[in-house]
C-alpha cells in the first residue's frame, strides 16, 4: 500500500477535491513540483496550468487552475486557487478561441490598453489549452 498525504483543492467557489493522494504535481513559480508524503514544508505561488493528483491505486485526476498558492505540511497539501476546473470539463475549442482573442487583443492596442491584463489573459488561455492537450495526450481524455 502506497504512502498517502491528504490533499485539498479549494477556490473562492468552494472545495473541489479533498482526499488522500500518493502525489501532487503542480506548476510552481520556479518550475514543476512533485509533492509526496514527507515533503519539506513549503508555500509557493502557482502559475496557471494543470494540477495532477495521483490518487490511491495510481489513478490520476487532473484539474486546471488559473493561478493560486500551494501549501505543503508534513501530512497535508493544500491548493488555494483563483479558479479551478476539472480538466475533463475544459473545452478545447473554447480554449482555442480564448487564445486567439487574447492574441488579437495584444495586437489591437488602444489608448487605454492594459498590457498586463492582456498578457494575463493570454497566459491563462494558453495554460487551459496546454491542460486540454496534456489530458488528451497522456490520459486519452
Curated annotation (Swiss-Prot):
Species this chain originates from: Pseudomonas fluorescens (strain Pf0-1)
Single GO term (MF): ATP binding
UniProt topology in membrane: Peripheral membrane protein
GO cellular-component term (any): plasma membrane
Stored CDD domains: F1-ATPase_delta
Top-level taxonomy: Bacteria, Pseudomonadati, Pseudomonadota, Gammaproteobacteria, Pseudomonadales
Regions crossing the membrane: none
Similarity field: Belongs to the ATPase epsilon chain family.
InterPro entries linked: ATP_F1_dsu/esu_C_sf, ATP_synth_F1_dsu/esu, ATP_synth_F1_dsu/esu_N, ATP_synth_F1_esu_C, ATPsynth_dsu/esu_N
Pfam families: ATP-synt_DE, ATP-synt_DE_N
Protein name per Swiss-Prot or TrEMBL: ATP synthase epsilon chain
Keyword line: ATP synthesis, Cell inner membrane, Cell membrane, CF(1), Hydrogen ion transport, Ion transport, Membrane, Transport
Keyword Protein biosynthesis on entry: no
